[in-house]
């Protein structure tokens, strides 16, 4: 009898060429977007010397992403998904070229940066939604947990590498190099994506796009299982906004500039460990209960984080949060894909991703408000323990999610 390993199995990259193409394209895309993410705030700060105008660019791009996720969900359920992915990526690349040309002007336009940020945020979201909706067809629903864990590792690795490369480019060549390489990387991602098979949506009656989107909302609200998963995801994303308190807590712990970096690295490190040790998650008989408990544990870790007497213990709490939130997120992703009808995958994935965007923004705003009334320690603890109380209530209320059972997939020799 073969025993399933705790470690993540990377065999999907060998056995599924289409997923391998997506993996490669996603990694290049994350690095490209990381170059952009470093360049835009630096350029606006250099042009205006205003942190408010820097924040405005983030807000505008986030708003465009939200709209793009809504529209992308409808398009992914209505049109051939490969075409939507390719169109979105190519259109994003055009926007990056625009940013590069604008940066080369003697006097770059701030308005152009904002407008191109709206452009890129919108079209990037279209591709994300279509790709999520297409994933079950690329790997099979029985491999979704494994695919999600590999994707999480890709995102974490790319998110670590790209800011470092972006910073070096800024120091040596200026923002135009960042934009130019981001555009080049985006167009390069089209090469592996062209090898994907056709990904048609399931046949369904034609209806007005708004009516189609409302149908997705109704399904989300009417399904205790899928709706509960989305709600937990939003709360978990709110908890991750604790990073806005890092500078203030660093002062409280009297941390040096070098030590502050450990706070920012702790959650990604914990999440990477969670993804690497997710080998048995797909074989859990009660994934809903495990999701609820791991979410509660992550809230407790945030509540304890601010109370730690030493910063190193705070880092341990953040790493624990990263690990538990990775477990919860992987279970959310897998259950959402398996419990959503094929005809609804685009819209539900769009709504699920959108709540991640809004949950982070709401969490940051709430923590900012708490920070104005409380000490940083009290703000962090209040947010964590407040979410823990809500989580306990959801553990009692979300009966269908708590009691959900699945038949674990059969373990083969290749899985060991």
UniProtKB/Swiss-Prot annotation:
Classification via InterPro entries: Enterobactin_exp_EntS (IPR023722), MFS_dom (IPR020846), MFS_trans_sf (IPR036259), TM_effector (IPR010290)
Gene3D superfamilies: MFS general substrate transporter like domains
Pfam families: MFS_3 (PF05977)
Residues exposed to the Periplasmic side: 43-55, 105-109, 178, 240-256, 308-313, 378
Side of membrane Cytoplasmic, spans: 1-21, 77-83, 131-156, 200-218, 278-287, 337-356, 400-416
Transmembrane spans: 22-42, 56-76, 84-104, 110-130, 157-177, 179-199, 219-239, 257-277, 288-307, 314-336, 357-377, 379-399
Membrane topology reported for the UniProt record: Multi-pass membrane protein
One GO CC term, this protein: plasma membrane
Protein's name according to its UniProt entry: Enterobactin exporter EntS
Biological source species: Shigella boydii serotype 4 (strain Sb227)
Lineage: Bacteria, Pseudomonadati, Pseudomonadota, Gammaproteobacteria, Enterobacterales
């Amino acid at each position: 009898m073969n025993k399933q390993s705790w470690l993540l199995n990377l065999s999907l990259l060998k056995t599924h060429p289409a997923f391998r193409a997506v993996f490669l394209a996603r990694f290049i895309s994350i690095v490209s977007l990381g170059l952009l993410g470093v360049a835009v705030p630096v350029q606006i700060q250099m042009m205006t010397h205003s942190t408010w105008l820097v924040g405005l660019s983030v807000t505008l791009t986030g708003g465009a992403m939200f709209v793009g996720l809504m529209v992308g969900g409808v398009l992914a359920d209505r049109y051939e998904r490969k075409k939507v992915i390719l169109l979105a990526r190519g259109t994003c690349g055009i926007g990056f070229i625009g940013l590069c040309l604008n940066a080369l002007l003697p006097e770059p336009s701030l308005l152009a940066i904002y407008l191109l940020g709206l452009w890129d945020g919108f079209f990037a979201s279209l591709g994300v939604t279509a790709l999520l909706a297409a994933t079950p067809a690329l790997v099979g629903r029985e491999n979704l947990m494994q695919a999600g864990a590999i994707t999480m590792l890709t995102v974490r690795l790319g998110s670590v590498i790209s800011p470092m490369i972006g910073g070096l480019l800024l120091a040596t060549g200026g923002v135009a190099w960042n934009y130019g390489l981001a555009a080049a990387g985006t167009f390069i991602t089209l090469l592996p994506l062209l090898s994907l098979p056709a990904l048609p949506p399931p046949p369904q009656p034609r209806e007005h796009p708004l009516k189609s989107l409302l149908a997705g909302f109704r399904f989300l609200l009417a399904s205790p299982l899928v709706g509960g998963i989305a709600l937990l995801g939003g709360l978990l994303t709110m908890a991750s906004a604790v990073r806005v308190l890092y500078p203030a807590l660093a002062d409280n712990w009297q941390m040096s500039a070098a030590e502050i970096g450990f706070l920012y690295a702790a959650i990604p490190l914990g999440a990477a460990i969670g993804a690497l040790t997710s080998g048995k998650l797909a074989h859990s008989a009660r994934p809903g209960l495990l999701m609820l408990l791991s979410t509660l544990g992550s809230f407790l870790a945030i509540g304890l984080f601010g109370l730690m007497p030493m910063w190193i213990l705070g880092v341990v709490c953040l790493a624990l949060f990263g690990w538990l939130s990775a477990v919860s997120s992987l279970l959310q992703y897998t259950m959402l894909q398996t419990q959503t009808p094929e005809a609804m995958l685009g819209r539900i994935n769009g709504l699920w991703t959108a709540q991640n965007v809004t949950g982070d923004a709401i969490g940051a705003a709430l923590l900012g408000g708490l920070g104005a009334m409380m000490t940083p320690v009290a703000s962090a603890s209040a947010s964590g323990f407040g979410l823990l109380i809500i989580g306990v209530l959801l553990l009692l209320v979300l009966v269908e999610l708590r009691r959900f059972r699945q038949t674990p997939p059969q373990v083969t020799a290749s899985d060991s």
